[in-house]
Protein backbone atom coordinates (compact mmCIF):
# COMPACT_ATOMS: atom_id res chain seq x y z
CA UNK A 1 0.00 0.00 0.00
CA UNK A 2 1.12 3.54 -0.54
CA UNK A 3 1.82 5.89 2.34
CA UNK A 4 -1.19 8.02 1.44
CA UNK A 5 -3.60 5.07 1.74
CA UNK A 6 -2.18 4.15 5.17
CA UNK A 7 -2.41 7.79 6.24
CA UNK A 8 -6.03 8.04 5.03
CA UNK A 9 -6.99 4.87 6.93
CA UNK A 10 -5.40 6.24 10.11
CA UNK A 11 -7.30 9.51 9.76
CA UNK A 12 -10.57 7.61 9.23
CA UNK A 13 -9.87 5.50 12.32
CA UNK A 14 -9.28 8.64 14.38
CA UNK A 15 -12.51 10.21 13.13
CA UNK A 16 -14.43 7.00 13.81
CA UNK A 17 -13.04 6.89 17.35
CA UNK A 18 -13.89 10.55 17.92
CA UNK A 19 -17.50 10.11 16.82
CA UNK A 20 -18.27 6.89 18.67
CA UNK A 21 -16.35 7.57 21.89
CA UNK A 22 -18.69 10.35 23.00
CA UNK A 23 -21.21 7.99 24.64
CA UNK A 24 -18.77 5.82 26.53
CA UNK A 25 -19.14 7.69 29.81
CA UNK A 26 -16.64 6.29 32.30
CA UNK A 27 -15.99 3.16 30.27
CA UNK A 28 -12.84 3.53 28.21
CA UNK A 29 -11.44 1.43 25.41
CA UNK A 30 -10.32 -1.24 27.90
CA UNK A 31 -13.80 -1.91 29.28
CA UNK A 32 -14.98 -0.89 32.74
CA UNK A 33 -12.46 0.75 35.07
CA UNK A 34 -10.49 -2.27 36.23
CA UNK A 35 -7.62 -0.49 37.95
CA UNK A 36 -4.25 -1.85 36.88
CA UNK A 37 -5.78 -4.15 34.24
CA UNK A 38 -6.62 -1.20 31.97
CA UNK A 39 -3.22 0.38 32.58
CA UNK A 40 -1.70 0.76 29.14
CA UNK A 41 -4.96 2.17 27.76
CA UNK A 42 -5.43 4.83 30.46
CA UNK A 43 -2.29 6.75 29.63
CA UNK A 44 1.18 6.79 31.13
CA UNK A 45 1.22 6.73 34.91
CA UNK A 46 -2.49 6.19 35.48
CA UNK A 47 -3.18 2.47 35.07
CA UNK A 48 -0.77 0.91 37.57
CA UNK A 49 -1.98 3.07 40.47
CA UNK A 50 -5.63 2.07 40.21
CA UNK A 51 -7.10 4.53 37.72
CA UNK A 52 -8.67 2.73 34.79
CA UNK A 53 -8.85 3.89 31.21
CA UNK A 54 -10.85 7.01 30.46
CA UNK A 55 -13.56 7.30 27.86
CA UNK A 56 -14.31 10.25 25.64
CA UNK A 57 -15.57 13.43 27.25
CA UNK A 58 -19.31 13.50 26.86
CA UNK A 59 -19.73 17.12 27.89
CA UNK A 60 -21.62 16.41 31.09
CA UNK A 61 -21.01 18.31 34.29
CA UNK A 62 -22.67 19.74 37.36
CA UNK A 63 -22.39 23.34 38.46
CA UNK A 64 -24.29 26.26 39.90
CA UNK A 65 -24.04 29.88 38.87
CA UNK A 66 -25.55 32.62 41.02
CA UNK A 67 -25.35 36.36 40.42
CA UNK A 68 -26.66 38.90 42.92
CA UNK A 69 -26.42 42.67 43.11
CA UNK A 70 -26.50 45.52 40.65
CA UNK A 71 -25.37 44.68 37.17
CA UNK A 72 -24.79 47.77 35.05
CA UNK A 73 -24.12 46.09 31.73
CA UNK A 74 -23.85 47.84 28.40
CA UNK A 75 -23.10 46.08 25.16
CA UNK A 76 -24.06 42.95 23.34
CA UNK A 77 -23.25 39.31 23.86
CA UNK A 78 -23.37 36.45 21.44
CA UNK A 79 -22.86 32.84 22.45
CA UNK A 80 -22.64 30.20 19.75
CA UNK A 81 -21.93 26.51 19.99
CA UNK A 82 -23.08 23.64 22.12
CA UNK A 83 -23.50 24.20 25.84
CA UNK A 84 -24.92 21.09 27.52
CA UNK A 85 -26.95 22.49 30.43
CA UNK A 86 -29.54 20.71 32.50
CA UNK A 87 -31.37 22.90 34.96
CA UNK A 88 -33.43 26.05 35.19
CA UNK A 89 -32.93 29.66 34.22
CA UNK A 90 -34.55 32.35 36.34
CA UNK A 91 -34.55 36.14 36.20
CA UNK A 92 -36.25 38.13 38.94
CA UNK A 93 -36.27 41.73 40.06
CA UNK A 94 -36.60 45.10 38.40
CA UNK A 95 -34.43 45.68 35.38
CA UNK A 96 -34.24 48.48 32.87
CA UNK A 97 -33.29 46.49 29.84
CA UNK A 98 -33.84 46.58 26.12
CA UNK A 99 -33.22 43.57 23.96
CA UNK A 100 -34.23 39.98 23.66
CA UNK A 101 -33.28 36.73 25.30
CA UNK A 102 -33.69 33.33 23.74
CA UNK A 103 -33.08 30.18 25.77
CA UNK A 104 -33.65 26.85 24.13
CA UNK A 105 -32.34 23.37 24.62
CA UNK A 106 -33.10 19.81 25.51
CA UNK A 107 -32.94 18.09 28.87
CA UNK A 108 -30.87 14.97 29.29
CA UNK A 109 -27.53 13.84 27.98
CA UNK A 110 -26.62 15.46 24.70
CA UNK A 111 -25.83 12.16 23.03
CA UNK A 112 -28.97 10.43 24.32
CA UNK A 113 -27.17 7.46 25.80
CA UNK A 114 -27.82 8.10 29.52
CA UNK A 115 -24.21 7.79 30.71
CA UNK A 116 -23.18 8.44 34.28
CA UNK A 117 -22.47 12.07 35.17
CA UNK A 118 -19.05 13.11 36.35
CA UNK A 119 -18.91 14.42 39.93
Curated annotation (Swiss-Prot):
Gene Ontology biological-process entries: chorion-containing eggshell formation
GO molecular function term, any single one: structural constituent of egg chorion
Ranges for region Central domain: 56-103
One Gene Ontology cellular component: egg chorion
Signal sequence residues: 1-21
InterPro entries membership: Chorion (IPR002635)
Disulphide bridges: none
Stretches for region Left arm: 22-55
Pfam families named in the record: Chorion_1 (PF01723)
Superkingdom of origin organism: Eukaryota
Alphabetically ordered keywords of this record: Repeat, Signal
Residue ranges of the region described as Right arm: 104-119
Family that this chain belongs to: Belongs to the chorion protein family.
General function of this protein: This protein is one of many from the eggshell of the silk moth.
Protein name: Chorion class CA protein ERA.3
Organism, scientific name: Bombyx mori
